[in-house]
């Protein structure tokens, strides 16, 4: 469940905001003092117009947050993005709730909103080069490499890996295999991706083991 942050979320937010490793993965200063945590929470709640809490449906407890913001200037200046409309996502999930599909579910919901209802051309998402779980999640969702940036953090300069996901309704088909693969790979049934000549170009892992045997791409 995604919703705006509420004052009642502060204790749950404070519980995961003090995680130093999470702060390092996000490139922010460590939050130890309650005043610093409060300042950070109030900013997200009151000043970020598109910051949403990621909430467990069963108990309505906050387990993370997701931001939708304008594209960073260095990425907005890239030639391949000129004339295109996009937004940047950032997210975090408390350690106890990671690897349970919550982040993927939240990101997919936001992507659907940005693509289907707001008609953006792309969604951009990145992570620091040492944040392997985030990188793998983005790639699993169909994001493709866009650029590397070197940015300052409280712990020193770090390199980021920036990814992009194109809107399938506004993008040439040649760019979309990664997107569609990410969608059908979530299905436990046999699903195939074909071109207009009905030639199989991709089968999800649940379909067959030997793609080439059935005329598909390896």
Task: Annotate each predicted stretch with a short phrase.
Residues 1-23, 51, 55-178:
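Acyl-donor (CoA/ACP) binding surface of acyl/acetyltransferases
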Residues 200-201:
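Conserved hydrophobic beta-strand signature of PAS-family and PAS-like sensory domains
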Residues 174-196:
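Sensory modules in modular signal-transduction proteins
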Residues 19, 204-211:
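N-terminal capping loop/helix in small sensory signaling domains highlighted by a polar->aromatic N-x2-3-F motif
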Residues 43-48, 182-185:
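Short loop/turn motifs at secondary-structure junctions and domain boundaries
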Residues 21-42:
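Conserved GNAT-fold acetyl-CoA-binding loop/helix
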Residues 39-42, 111, 218:
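Terminal output helix/cap of sensory domains in signal transduction proteins
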Residues 27, 216-218:
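PAS-family sensory/regulatory domains
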